[in-house]
């Protein structure tokens, strides 16, 4: 019986129907959007803290961004206590050292949700998470930079990615075009056409 079970297991592995357990990994996505004269930042996902080193002191920072220094934090505009983890110096962290030019922090005008941020160190990367964060817990937050543009904040549009321990953190910097006059006219015409159709069906 044992021999039969082992043979069946090998067949499933060879067919790709059964795979050995792999180390867990988590992903978190951050998006900066420029739209209608403001910049918004959102963070969503979860993290696996395995292999990351907890710092003894985690400063309470408000949400902000300094792209030239490779720093951003999403969440409340007020200083919030957080836990700061570092990638170790043995190579379990990689990614861009900057995503723009401004090295001075610009704080968000408002924000809400869980703390999440990345800071670039000489030999490692730092990760800000909610105080007492447990691996796999959902992180959701947003911040607003009212009246700001990517140019004001020194952010370069594009897509950036960090490999931090078992985690992949992506940062997308995208501009959302404002609606043109032509698109507004088309929208109004579509709504008007729909109303006429409903009237015909009503008759």
Q: Where are the language model's segments positioned?
A:
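C-terminal segment of classical bacterial N-terminal signal peptides
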Residues: 15-22, 195-196
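Mature extracellular "passenger" or substrate-interacting domains of secreted, surface-exposed proteins
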Residues: 24-175
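Sec-dependent N-terminal signal peptides
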Residues: 7-13, 185-189
